[in-house]
Curated annotation (Swiss-Prot):
Transit peptide, residue positions per record: 1-34
Cited function: Converts stearoyl-ACP to oleoyl-ACP by introduction of a cis double bond between carbons 9 and 10 of the acyl chain.
Compartments, record wording: Plastid, Chloroplast; Plastid
Full protein name: Stearoyl-[acyl-carrier-protein] 9-desaturase, chloroplastic
Residues engaged in binding Fe cation 2: E178, E231, E264, H267
Residues reported in the UniProt entry to bind Fe cation 1: E140, E178, H181, E264
Region annotation (Disordered) ranges: 46-66
Organism phylogeny: Eukaryota, Viridiplantae, Streptophyta, Embryophyta, Tracheophyta
Catalytic activity: octadecanoyl-[ACP] + 2 reduced [2Fe-2S]-[ferredoxin] + O2 + 2 H(+) = (9Z)-octadecenoyl-[ACP] + 2 oxidized [2Fe-2S]-[ferredoxin] + 2 H2O
Pathway linked to the protein: Lipid metabolism; fatty acid metabolism
């Protein structure tokens, strides 16, 4: 979801949550800043062993349709603007790269030799890197969930499945572009012969079946803030996997991750422009939504990940990603700071009392997150060995 950021990995013992933050970020003291009237009800993720037809991990007590109905008119009025300012960030299909551009050609006489070369390049890649790349791929493969999520948003959803509104065109075309990411990473990992594809496929099926709980409440203010954050997070994550692939000697894989990161950057630009427009026409509503989302903390899209074995799979995968510097708590703070600056939140004028409180909260949050991350990093915690089914139950330090 490009090869820009280069972060130092956090201490392997630094535990993370589904929001990508150190557990210390969830301290009680953080709650004193709650001021928004649109705060959602906290949801819990719990294992479900009672009903076989229910997803193994559920998101409970969800709030819906929190945006006042009159604000739907804002998004209807932005149809023309979106056509000129958002759809321009899509690429025509004929100008897009396709997964086959980076994979051995099965129609070629040299196909087997190309596969052998790929396996030779990847045989020394560390298991930790493979786990993170698999987790990234699984996240990309849960694309049906993300299109579903976008189509829950009031005022911008695709009402027919083939609507010609700018918002609907964007959602379908964005989904189509993103679809290439999981396809490419899936096939590449399959060809390495180093991962358990059946366990990976089960994880993907479990994840799509479980859905996701971004706590966007059918509210496009919250939804587009979430996607702005997530597209930048995936840009950073894929950029860092590209850098590490190069360090491990697989320049083809580095190119694969880099080209995906470039897509994510382009998509980030589109989503951040939407939120920037909301700050322009409704600064109070936009800053309240931003504060609300940050108080709830931005959950990663795959936070309900499960492989049929590990109830803490997402947390363990995230811990490894943090160890090797692919996505860290520092990145979370950097993303927030980037968006606050991009949307000029500090310079907002004419806000309500609640709006001023929200402004103060979000403008001061990134430094607080960094301090909490540094504190968590300094704490020595026991390291445990955890088996990952994706790599044939090999154990990694978490």
């Amino acid at each position: 979801m490009a090869l820009k950021l280069h972060h130092t990995a956090f201490n392997p013992s630094m535990a993370v949550t589904s929001s990508g933050l150190p557990r210390s970020y969830h301290l009680r003291s953080h709650r004193v800043f709650m001021a928004s009237s649109t705060i959602g009800i906290t949801s819990k993720e719990i294992p479900n062993a009672k009903k076989p037809h229910m997803p193994p991990r559920e998101a409970h007590v969800q709030k819906t349709h929190s945006m006042p109905p009159q604000k739907i008119e804002i998004f209807k009025s932005l149809e023309g603007w979106a056509e000129e300012n958002v759809l321009v960030h899509l690429k025509p299909v004929e100008k897009c790269w396709q997964p086959q551009d980076f994979l051995p050609d099965p129609a070629s006489e040299g196909f087997m030799d190309q596969v052998k070369e790929l396996r030779e390049r990847t045989k020394e890649i560390p298991d930790e890197y493979l786990v993170v790349l698999v987790g990234d791929m699984i996240t990309e493969e849960a694309l049906p969930t993300y299109q579903t999520m976008l189509n829950t948003l009031d005022g911008v959803r695709d009402e027919t499945g083939a609507s010609l509104t700018s918002w609907a065109i964007w959602t379908r075309a964005w989904t189509a572009e993103e679809n290439r990411h999981g396809d490419l990473l899936n096939k590449y990992l399959y060809l390495t012969g180093r991962v358990d594809m059946k366990q990976i496929e089960k994880t993907i099926q479990y994840l799509i079946g479980s859905g996701m709980d971004p706590r966007s409440e059918n509210n496009p203010y919250l939804g587009f803030i979430y996607t702005s954050f997530q597209e930048r997070a995936t840009f950073i994550s894929h950029g860092n996997t590209a850098r590490l692939a190069k360090d491990h000697g697989d320049f083809q894989l580095a190119q694969v991750c880099g080209i995906i990161a470039a897509d994510e950057k382009r998509h980030e630009t589109a989503y951040t422009k939407i939120v920037e427009k909301l700050f322009e026409i409704d600064p109070d509503g936009a800053v309240l939504a931003l504060a609300d989302m940050m108080r709830k903390k931005v959950s990663m899209p795959a936070h309900l990940m499960y492989d049929g074995k590990d109830d803490n799979l997402f947390e363990n995968y995230s811990a490894v990603a943090q160890q090797i510097g692919v996505y860290t708590a520092k990145d979370y703070a950097d993303i927030l700071e980037h968006l606050v600056n991009r949307w000029k939140v500090e310079n907002l004028m004419g806000l309500s009392g609640e709006g001023h409180k929200a402004q103060d909260f979000v403008c001061g949050l990134a430094p607080r997150i960094r301090k909490l991350g540094e504190r968590a990093q300094s704490l020595s915690k026991p390291v445990s060995l955890v088996p990952f089914s994706w790599i044939f139950n090999k154990e990694l330090k978490v």
